[in-house]
Amino acid sequence: MRASDVERYRQYAKTCQDTDYGKPDSVRAHNRAVTSMYKTVEKAAAEGNQAIQALAILLDEPITREWLAFQLLDKGCDVPPDLEQKCLQIIQGIANDPSRYADAFASREWLKRWEQKHQSSSR
């Protein structure tokens, strides 16, 4: 994972943050950025723990932390337990934020699916 990959991930997250949902071109740019973020996470997963750790610095940045928390866990990356817990704490923070009604609801649903998946895989 090169520093340029991490910087591009930041840029993709900024594109998503700046999305104007009333403008189709902006929405298309948002969708391309999300796809590119997932590709970056997949690349890190393929490269292994050191690459995941390099990308994980973005969990401490406001614009990237939420995107990366979901994406690391969604992609089934071999995330070390401490990073998994950090990602889950970020997602739980969204789920418990009453000022973010739609995001909170979606995060609670995501957490339910996560827990179901991991309960069944630990049996």
Spell out what each predicted region is:
Residues D60-K86:
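Mid-chain, well-packed structural core segment of small domains
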Residues Q85-R123:
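Short, Lys/Arg-rich amphipathic alpha-helical interaction segments
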Residues T40-K43, Q71, K75, W110-R113:
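Core register positions within helices of long alpha-helical scaffolds
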Residues G48, G76-P80, E115:
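Alpha-solenoid repeat junctions
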Residues M1-N49, Q53:
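N-terminal interaction/assembly modules
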Residues A3-V6, A46-I57, P81-G93, S120-R123:
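Amphipathic alpha-helical scaffolding segments comprising HEAT/armadillo-like alpha-solenoid repeats
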